[in-house]
């Protein structure tokens, strides 16, 4: 038996070998192996890792992606280490198209040409993005002036809250002015949409399709170049070779493909997104980074609030107020009057407060009720406000105004169903609780705002001038506000505020 040093590669023409490997001396560095077989015999096949990677079939690597924030892991995790979400990981098997043109390439919401070309900032022209008015003033307010050509807007909200109704009204307004509207119906039949359109009084002719393949939608945008494209919903859009519809990869890559098509064709595009049980848009968080604008539609009492949380073409935090009626979502032009319409007069514990929700000033009613407690420990119930701030205000009233609250249950409510974490409501809470305890109602023409500190001082708040202007438009002549506001004397402490109200 002789030891033979043999250089191998992966092809073989031996009669006894079905793997296709044969000795090859003229290939250097392919791998040196010592065989103890007799030289005339066929050399057995050996697996040579790394000698020729093209001969191997690569092992499919499975990733797990958090459907909340897009965090990737090699194994499923119970809790995402990035966003702390529980049971949010979904399996994703990379396909051939994942690294291709429909994959992660160009995920950002930009419309530039790919490549290595550099452009100096000084040579870039200055121009405003053209806007298309939606025909609904409250929606235009939230979007910053209207729909931007080539901009992509993501609208989220609970099922049945009115997303499709609002967008069908917008489509009617745009089409009635001569613009072409493409409506992609992924969840409803065309007959169902026709019935809703008849109920809403939609008279314009819309171009509709039920084809939810992202490649085909992009082709329609390129062919027709509509003024507005509505996709209802993004969770029904599919991309070839990217897994099941509604999955992380489908939603991510479908959004990226439609965004690129919208930028290239200059089409204002609106994507409808489902929400999870905690109120966030279903799908990977990267989807919200791709789009230009993200707005949410939520229910507050009898009203619908449209709130922007991201806007590349305007100011985020804008708020629009709507009311659902038989003819659709109707814009509420004066939210302050709407929220104060049912306010009782001459009742202790009721105060009109000037607040700011997002970027919009409005007047709301702060209510307080104090009653003797039958329990050893008095209760504190807060609705619509920050409970910790209310506890601070109650402590200030006890310490600085000698108001006894230890044996009283105190209830504080922000009427209307809104939840506003505004420090400027502190003074309204203080006066409402004081009014409820002493049993004296505030005058009808008084509105207040201001932050209360631990020393009992009244501090200034953001957007004080806009708050005062909103109160003036509503007819409130007396303002109890912090010092420093033009035309107003201002109060420096809670004690001064009490004296100013009941002077």
From Swiss-Prot:
Binding-site residues, ATP: 157-164
Annotated knockout phenotype: Moderately decreased resistance to gamma and UV irradiation, no effect on H(2)O(2) resistance. Slightly reduced DNA synthesis rate even in the absence of ionizing radiation (IR); after IR chromosome fragment assembly is delayed. Double recA-radA deletion mutants have lower rates of DNA synthesis than the recA deletion alone with or without IR.
Region Lon-protease-like, annotated ranges: 409-503
Short sequence motif named RadA KNRFG motif, residue ranges: 310-314
GO molecular function, one term: zinc ion binding
Domain of life from the UniProt record: Bacteria
Pfam families according to UniProt: AAA_25, ChlI, Zn_ribbon_LapB
UniProt EC number: 3.6.4.-
Region of interest called Disordered, as start-end residue ranges on this chain: 118-138
Keywords carried by this UniProt record: ATP-binding, DNA damage, DNA repair, DNA-binding, Hydrolase, Metal-binding, Nucleotide-binding, Stress response, Zinc, Zinc-finger
Protein's GO biological process: recombinational repair
SMART domains: AAA
Gene3D superfamilies, alphabetized: 3.30.230.10, P-loop containing nucleotide triphosphate hydrolases (3.40.50.300)
Zinc finger residue ranges, C4-type: 66-83
Cited PANTHER family: DNA REPAIR PROTEIN RADA, DNA REPAIR PROTEIN RADA-LIKE PROTEIN
Domains: entry comment: Has a putative N-terminal zinc-finger, a middle region with homology to RecA with ATPase motifs including the RadA KNRFG motif, while the C-terminus is homologous to Lon protease. Absence of the zinc-finger domain gives a slight increase in sensitivity to gamma and UV irradiation, absence of the Lon protease domain gives slightly increased resistance to gamma and UV irradiation.
Primary role: DNA-dependent ATPase involved in processing of recombination intermediates, plays a role in repairing DNA breaks. Stimulates the branch migration of RecA-mediated strand transfer reactions, allowing the 3' invading strand to extend heteroduplex DNA faster. Binds ssDNA in the presence of ADP but not other nucleotides, has ATPase activity that is stimulated by ssDNA and various branched DNA structures, but inhibited by SSB. Does not have RecA's homology-searching function.
Stated family: Belongs to the RecA family. RadA subfamily.
NCBIfam families xrefs: sms
Name of the protein: DNA repair protein RadA
Source species: Deinococcus radiodurans (strain ATCC 13939 / DSM 20539 / JCM 16871 / CCUG 27074 / LMG 4051 / NBRC 15346 / NCIMB 9279 / VKM B-1422 / R1)
């Amino acid at each position: 038996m002789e030891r033979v040093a043999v250089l191998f590669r992966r092809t073989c023409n031996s009669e006894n070998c079905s793997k296709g490997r044969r000795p090859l001396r003229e290939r250097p560095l392919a791998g040196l192996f010592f065989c103890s077989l007799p030289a005339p015999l066929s050399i057995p096949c050996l697996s040579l890792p790394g000698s020729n990677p093209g001969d191997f079939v690569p092992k499919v690597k499975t990733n797990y992606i958090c459907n909340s924030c897009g965090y990737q892991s090699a194994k499923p995790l119970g809790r995402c280490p990035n966003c702390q979400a529980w049971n949010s990981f979904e399996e994703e098997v990379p396909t051939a198209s994942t690294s291709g043109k429909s994959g992660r390439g160009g995920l950002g919401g930009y419309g530039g040409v790919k490549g290595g070309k550099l452009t100096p900032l000084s040579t870039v022209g200055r121009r405003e993005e053209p806007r298309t008015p939606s025909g609904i003033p409250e929606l235009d307010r939230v979007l910053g002036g209207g729909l931007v050509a080539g901009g992509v807007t993501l609208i989220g909200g609970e099922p049945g809250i009115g997303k499709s109704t609002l967008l069908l009204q917008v489509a009617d307004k745009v089409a009635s002015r001569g613009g072409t509207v493409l409506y992609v119906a992924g969840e409803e039949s065309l007959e169902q949409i026709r019935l809703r359109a008849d109920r809403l009084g939609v008279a314009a002719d819309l171009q509709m399709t039920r084809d939810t393949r992202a490649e085909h939608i992009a082709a329609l945008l390129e062919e027709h170049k509509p003024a507005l494209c509505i996709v209802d919903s993004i969770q029904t859009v599919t991309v070839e070779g990217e897994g099941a519809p509604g999955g992380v990869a489908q939603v991510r890559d479908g959004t990226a493909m439609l965004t690129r098509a919208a930028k290239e064709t200059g089409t204002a595009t609106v994507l409808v997104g489902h929400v999870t049980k905690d109120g966030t848009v279903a799908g990977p968080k990267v989807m919200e980074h791709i789009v230009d604008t993200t707005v949410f539609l939520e229910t507050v009492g009898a009203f619908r609030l449209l709130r922007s949380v991201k806007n590349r073409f305007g100011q985020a935090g804008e708020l629009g107020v709507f009311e659902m009626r038989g003819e659709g979502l109707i814009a509420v032009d004066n939210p302050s009057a709407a929220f104060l319409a049912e306010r009782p007069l001459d009742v202790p514990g009721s105060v009109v407060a000037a607040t700011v929700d997002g970027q919009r000033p409005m007047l709301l009613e702060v209510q307080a009720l104090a009653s003797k407690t039958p329990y050893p420990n008095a209760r504190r119930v807060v609705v619509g406000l920050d409970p910790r701030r209310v506890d601070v205000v109650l402590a200030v009233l006890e310490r600085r105004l000698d108001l006894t609250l230890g044996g009283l249950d105190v209830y504080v409510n922000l009427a209307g169903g809104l939840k506003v974490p505004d420090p400027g409501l502190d003074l309204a809470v203080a006066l409402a609780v004081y009014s409820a305890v002493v049993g004296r109602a505030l005058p009808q023409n008084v509105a207040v705002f201001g932050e209360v500190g631990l020393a009992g001082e009244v501090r200034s708040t953001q957007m004080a001038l806009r708050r005062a202007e909103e109160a003036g438009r509503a007819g409130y002549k007396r303002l109890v506000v912090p010092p420093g506001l033009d035309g107003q004397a201002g109060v420096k402490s809670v004690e001064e505020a009490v004296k100013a109200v009941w002077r």
